[in-house]
């Protein structure tokens, strides 16, 4: 295929030199070219048939960095265009340059610098076979002349260059004779299989003319060519260096990053520009290493860069150079898109600042080693770079104006679009290596597939026609955008939203909806992606934005979380959009996405009770929340997969894989899941991820959920973390419904289960389970405990109970929201396909240990050797600046020592200079070594001492390292030449050498073997024959120099090891001497012989011999006393009896907190002491039942965490004893804190100096929260450490526990006691002081609240006690003064007094005395009988019981009598008026009884009113003319009161407990009042006859005598009325007869007097009137019958009095 440079066709494999002339070259340049030509002839440089060949080692001369054309002529400052590097014209091919079949080589990116073949050792030619191991070594130049094989190297068209020092194992029959596959064939295969795109850094110049610095972009597919020699000698092309001082092996002096370059002087003086010199370390390094050599072409580079800067700003003013922005210097911040830029897009002048180099690549201060770097990856699509034209064009025919070039570009685009119309379909974005994302490039290219390979060769000629844009420019894929927005919200958006008032509450300044600030406004999500860089935030700003958003979550969970979530969700969505637009897929992006997912997970639970908002109301859309979490998870998992393909394992991947698996358990509200989704997701996971604990947990949950095993499901929910529980919470309702349905089907009607067991099974211990049970048709019945009972059908089987937040989940959440959302602190590691051996790191300088801070790792399956490293997050490393060192500095570094294996030494290379050692296509470039002792007459040969690792023939050395024997089994990693010249001062101590792990490349090499086509294979075979004629002599000569260098390096390394060892041994020797001196001083301080004692000491010394038995006996007794059980009642009984003398049974309870669960097993000595103290305290106070002796009657009950002790105390006599019960309860043994502290009289807290005081304070506050207000309990703080003889409160403990800040209504006083023995201070504590613990209990008993002195009464007795005194007072008052309301008021007051007595007694018991543990006693014990007799019920003071009694008394109150009775004061002149008044009064009483008080019905009220008026109404004659009806209201209402208090006989509320003091006080006050007022009132008048009798007798003269028959009828009616009344009374009172038998009769003297007076007055009236004898006899009989009826009624109604 013809090759057309500048429109001239050349045949394939043409050896004709390119017509390349240095247009516009200066005289200096021409002189240099002439000198170079002569110099080349003198050194015997063997040229091909081309006219001029460049010298092979000029990189080491003073003219290093000059550019040469393919013909060998030096390019001047006005280079028009570099011809292509074909197989015959350009004698050298760049490392990794893809071979173009037919002799067509893609245009190298032109940097005004020659290709790497122009200097130092040329890169392997296209036909060079792959060398799997070893390294290329070339002698160091001497006086600017290179020595080595380059001096006599022929063109690769004649004989391909054999890369020296490489061992070639036999990997496949199709490889060469030495085991390595031919490069041409591999390249052909790869170019058809996967040709990754080549992204370019393009520096705009003259419109469309540009200098393009090629970067290789990785494709998703891994090809075999990644491990071949044309691809950076076995290194992956995925790890490529950014734009630096070397590109394509050439010194790009002028192409320093814009952020570090400021042109302050004119181009003519560029060579003396200090700013430029300071910003280009590579130039300084080169100057240092070449003596006084200078750069004669420096002004040319300056001219080019100055023109580039002016032209780029003039042509594309909108394309602002982004490199000047420091925020663009990101590490791992960009990922290249596989889509090309849009049409018409100009090349950004993008560059990287010097501090944004790859930190993970080795750097060097020697610029020569970078001559091997190439800019285009092997087997990539061609990178067509336009020629560089100077501003001053000399020859018009080679001058291309901007307009013409633009037209040419449009024509070329149209041609390419027509030619590749069917092949330019958009392809999906593929994961791109993180290494490639380092460079902020705005242009991308798509990889070529097999169909595009041939056309790509055809289109290579377009590169010679001035078209520098990629082939796929007209594709529809969006271009890569680099954000430059400096704020969290773009200024334009911020202003627009201020005008519209579209500001969230969190963005407003002082609540103003039209005002915000830079620190508050956050970019809002829009569906239309921004295409302007100023509207997109770069990675640092995105991180700051996320930090700001998370700062809003630094608060506890509350109801404001809904509004905050709606704000954060939208803003985080905008962050995801900016990440996608910039193709940022690095570790920092992973962290951001993980935080977003955590927020969505938390919202699933915390906002589950909210519904979707309508209108302007806020709401929570569960479906939308899960949808966004799903999308975020998909992006996150793609990043995980990309990192895994590069050998990087993200520690949090397993966590989020587990979350995603929990999300796919089953369908739930807001999300539908197919049954096979979880299985597919698990199948797509790697085996390692599938076996992690998080994923296994999710699989167990899924198994329990899908099988309906609700017990296992909620057991796992208790073990889950907070986020896992939030995901599981979505299935709580469903599992609970299934659980209740299954239990319902297994129960029969009226069968049930304990509610407590059910709540434990379904995780609702502290929730409203009753509502759930009733929702599904169960009923709650209380037996010994509440039971859920099956009544009928199971309800709502198809509809779950409404979802609510679960307390089971709430128990797991952190204090603030941000703690749950933020990523946990993890140490990032790098996984390898094989396990890493254990490394023992010795820091030889400063005794520091550290890990290599590589930012990028080598991808797996890319090379035979893989170097892995540990990452440390240190963002400041990339910004650090280190000074360049002099070349005479000696190397210094840390090393790794592995005793059983080889000893490895790696160089310490500063992070900013690692790119100088790295080629554009690999993580570690093939580094050349230059020996100062090298000879020019010995070419390089292969290394003869490279050996395979034992037991693994796949393991070989990577080209970047050499292993050689030093002493025994000591090996060292290769130290690059520049690294040997660094100073120890510049070497960071946090760098550790990495370990090389071999990989099997078989799968990689054979991956695309079936994708080759027949024509391409034939072409490769043709080219392979031409390049396989290799001279074996070069290999032999290479081995000689390599062996010499090995020996020199081995000596240097051995000296380094010896020097380091000497330093370490000197320090050890110094330490040993110090120890010896200290030991000698201690020995000299000892006394010699018997100590001198004074007479005073001898006199005070006790006589007698030391008795070891006696000492051991005392120790044994002390130990027995310390560990003996402590009967609390025995210690405090006397004190409690003295404080409660009237109590027959005393109950006292102490609550213990030993903090046993807070002490870890592997703790400090102080924590071990605390653990021993907690065990000692528990064994003394709460011994196990099996450990207690059988004859110990004082221990009534013992169980884990609780014990009941007893002691009988004589109370003044041998017969009267008081039972003293004491209870010890441990709060950590039970989960219900309120039940544990119920009835507590004191609190004992075991503190420790070893545990954090803040944690102990939280534990103490947790206990005190369950203590009711007003308890005023004493607190005893027991510490296990000794604080001296005086037990003064320790200031640290008091302040640490916050004892002074405790609520005084709960804790009235506190005391601190140390239980450690005084002699044990500073020593190990073996046993503790028993006496101090006893003293502490005595203090607690003395300060505990008194036991209430209660009196058990019945409600009727309590009421009558208060009402009887008021009733006596009312009876002493005249009838005219006592009205109905006065009687009602006295009745209601007595009821209210009774209610107050009951309430005051309950309020006097805030602690819930007596403690419920007293019910644990056996029924047959005497103590149990005392408890039941003298102690009240457990719920006597409960709010429910008090409320019940109060409501009963309140319902007994009577309403006021509102009728006006003034008409009673008007007298009656006739009997008719008397009858009318009587009937009117009767009507008032009937209305009161039936309507106002609702006491009885109308019929009963009518009869009862007649009886009341007959007994308690009299007729008085005033002024001898008018009669007045005077009712006795106290008698009337006494009968009404009796009816009212019948409600107090209810059995459930018939008794109550009151304080004896209140009852005695009420009795005494009423007695005093009665005695004081008794004399002022007259005695009660005798009882009068019935009302109708008085009316008949008194008014008989005024009436006509009734006929006999009428009287008889009246008598009969009266008898019938009495009989009917008797029947009514008997039937009504029959119910209460049994209840009234035990009540004393309360018949007053008035009733007895009334009976006697009634008989006498009847007889007197009969005698006075002298009625006929028969009538008087009948009247007497009638009176007798009435008296009998009245007596029987009085006997029946005696219960009311």
Curated annotation (Swiss-Prot):
Annotated InterPro entries: MCM3AP_GANP, PCI_dom, SAC3/GANP/THP3, SAC3/GANP/THP3_conserved
Matching PROSITE patterns: PCI (PS50250)
Subcellular location: Nucleus
Occurrences of domain PCI (ranges): 625-813
Stretches with biased composition (Basic and acidic residues): 178-192, 215-227
Subunit and partners: Interacts with SAC3A, EER5 and CML19. Interacts with UCH1 and UCH2.
Descriptive protein name: SAC3 family protein B
